[in-house]
Amino acid sequence: MLLIPAIDLKDGKCVRLKQGDMNDSTTFGEDPAAMARRWVDAGARRLHLVDLNGAFAGKPVNEGAIKSIIAAVGGDIPIQLGGGIRDLDTIERYLDDGLSYVIIGTAAVKNPGFLRDACTAFGGHIIVGLDARDGKVATDGWSKLTGHEVVDLARKFQDYGVEGVIYTDIGRDGMLSGINIEATVKLAQALTIPVIASGGLSNMADIDALCAVEHEGVDGVICGRSIYSGDLDFAAGQKRADELNGGRV
C-alpha cells in the first residue's frame, strides 16, 4: 500500500482546498520543490501533484512549480500530475519534462476519445481521475455533477488502456472525515487495474482499513490535509502500511 503525498499548487504555492473550493484554501508552503523533498525524505515512493489553477483554467498554469519539483525529486521517485490536461501536446510536454504519469479527469469524461487517443499514444503513462459524490461523477473542478456512474465509466476507461484509477470522494476531501472504504472497494472489485483512494484520509485507522482491502485492488492512497495539519505522521503511516502488507512494496 503506497501512501502518496499530494502537493496541490495554487499560484505557485502549496495549498489545500476544502471540498475543492478555490476560495477556501490554506497555504502550507511557498516552495513546492522543498515540499517535495520533504516528503521524499520522509519515505514517499510516489508524489501526486495537482495544478489547481490549471484544473479551473483548462490549461497548465503552474508549470514553473511543477518543473522545480521534477528537478528536485524526479530522479528519485515517480511523479504523477493532474489538472488542466486537455490535449496530447500537453501530455507529451509533461512526460518529456520527466513526469511518470499524467492524470486525466474532466477531459476524460467530456471527451472519451481524447482519453483513448492518450492511452494509444502514451501507453503506461495515463491514469484517469474520477471524482464522485454519491457514486455520480463530477467534472470541472468538482463544480458540475454528471449522471455518469463511477463504476460504468471506470470499466469503459479500463478498456481504453488506462494504467489505473484515482477515485476521489468529493464529500470527504479535505474534511479529515475518513476514506469512503465501501465505495472505493466497490470500484476496485469491478476493475482489474489498480485503484488509488483519495479524499478524507485522516489517521492510522484509515490506513489499517485500507490495508485490509488491498487484496481487492486498492493499491494506494493520496495523503492530503492530514499530513499537512499533523493529524497523520506520513513516515509512520507508510511504515505501518509496509508492516501490514508484509514489507516494503
From Swiss-Prot:
Task: Identify the EC number(s).
Answer: 5.3.1.16
Keyword check for Coiled coil: no
- MF (Gene Ontology): 1-(5-phosphoribosyl)-5-[(5-phosphoribosylamino)methylideneamino]imidazole-4-carboxamide isomerase activity
| Segment forming the signal sequence | none
- Locate the active site: D8 (proton acceptor), D131 (proton donor)
**Has keyword Phosphoprotein?**
no
Q: Which family does it belong to?
A: Belongs to the HisA/HisF family.
Recorded protein name is 1-(5-phosphoribosyl)-5-[(5-phosphoribosylamino)methylideneamino] imidazole-4-carboxamide isomerase
State the organism of origin. Leptothrix cholodnii (strain ATCC 51168 / LMG 8142 / SP-6)
